[in-house]
Amino acid sequence: MVEWFVCSRTFKIIMHCDLFPTRIYVEQNFLESEEFDEIKLLVKKDKEYLDVPDFAKKVAMHMETICDDLGVDFQSYDSIQVTETWGNVLNKGDGHPVHTHSNHVFSGVFYLTDGNPTIFMEPRPAADCFSLHYKQDSEWFYGSRVTAPAVPNTLIIFPSWLGHFVMPNRTEEVRKSISFNIILRGRYGQPGSLQECRI
């Protein structure tokens, strides 16, 4: 959708549209306090797979709203599935290098404690060839890196192809979170073409 606006100084009509937008969804207070206290106790070791069906079901329900916002045609898909969840435990000196989540459509992080933020990378390599100085609140729109603070009981969902990392923990406080991957079960690609597949 193209939005039009008038520049107040020159009175010229300028076209404004967001090309190739990347949406990141953030929800604070995702779980009720009792649920949050229970799930915090489950994360004991780094990269340990978790069996949390109630959490996964709630994430899948939120994905329905997100897919609707993105204009995804649900008739092409059978279900939304959280394929795996695992704990992240970052002690002093630990971090996560830049990575993506292969073979999935969406991924996410759920913060159990505060600590270093998740930093998302600009996915277009040439976009930061000329770096301007932006106001702090413009980072989400124009920065080459976007910082998502680690706030306990906050859920962040993002495209799996979006590179992200966490700087090494410089404190004695342990940073804990839960990561997860999501797939839409159903048909992908152009129907009737050699590129069509069913997942």
Language-model-detected regions and their locations in the chain:
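Non-heme Fe(II)/2-oxoglutarate
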Residues: 8-78, 85-86, 93-96, 194-199
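Beta-rich strand-turn-strand
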Residues: 154-158, 163, 172
